Every structure is written in C-alpha cells, then in structure tokens.
C-alpha cells in the first residue's frame, strides 16, 4: 500500500529545518511587532520609529532569504515524483506569485510592507489598487504561490506538503494580524474625531 512516506523523506534534516523556518518567520515578526507596538523597544533602541522599522524590515527580509534557501535545499534532498513534475504550471504560478509580492511591496513601500503601522507609521488611506483589488493579502498568497510553483517545477511532493504548511501559517497569521491592524487604524480615527470635537469646542 502506497503511503505519503513513499514520496516524502521525513527523515531528512533539511525537511525539518525547512518546516521550522517556515513556521518561525511569521511567528517571529508578529511577536516582535506586537512587542514594539506595546513597548516601543525598537524605537527606543534605534532612536526613531522609521529606523526601528527599517531594522525589522532588513531582519524579516533576511530571514525570508534564509528560509527560501533552506526550502530549496530541502527539495533537493527529497524524492522526485513524476506526476507532480509540472514545470510549465510551476513556472506560471511562480511568476504570478512574484507579481503579487513585488507589486504589493511597490504599492505599500518599505514601512507599509514591513509592519510600519506597529511603529505608529500609518498610511493615509488603504491601498485599493492592484494587487489589492485581486486579493487583500497579496504578499502572503503570492509567497504561497511561489512555494507551490517551485515544488511543481521540481516535481517534489515534499514541496507541496511544505506549501500547505505555508498556507496554514499565513492563514492563522492573517486571523491574528488583520483585527489588530484594523484596531490600530480605528484608534487613529477615534483620536482624529476626538481632536476635531475638541477644536470645535474651543
């Protein structure tokens, strides 16, 4: 009887490291961002919310590069399975994912992409143009498509399994992040409304 272990070598350390790095990154940036929001520790260390945000951006970007390298290495160590070797589809998914990620970064800028709102660096208005008119979370879903695209391009079931882990973690991250971010902006609007009322009463 065929089992998943026939297509995925769970004994490979590289597979375990890939899973750990995939799990670590969103947990790390959410924990650090919330700590910054509550205590402003990065702002105090670097003397400015912008410098603190740039430091976090470089850290998150570097961790992402490391995660991608570990993922690529993990796939090299995994069995090849011909039915999931779909290089054309994999390349197309990777291209679409890259467009979503890069256009999102362009639309949001550094501080918008890398949790600037937790530093008090808020955007004047939500971005509603491309790619946000396609999906509300283009960075996350674009990245997920990149993982899947690489897995299909290389014909590795392990890559599909790790992509599922990416999807689950990003889904939970959004459930955690979206309400918190919405409250940050709602708080700003309440403060603006209060300030306007105070100005009228003077």
Curated annotation (Swiss-Prot):
Name any Gene Ontology BP term: methylation
**Enzyme category, top tier:** transferase
The membrane spanning regions, by residue number, are: 46-66, 91-111, 155-175
Which InterPro entries would you find in this protein's record? PEMT/MFAP, Phopholipid_MeTrfase
What EC number(s) would the UniProt record show? 2.1.1.71
- Cytoplasmic compartment ranges equal 67-90, 176-202
Q: How is this protein annotated for GO cellular component?
A: endoplasmic reticulum membrane; mitochondrial membrane
User: Where does the protein end up?
Assistant: Endoplasmic reticulum membrane; Mitochondrion membrane
Indicate what this protein is called per its UniProt record.
Phosphatidyl-N-methylethanolamine N-methyltransferase
What gene is it encoded by? choC
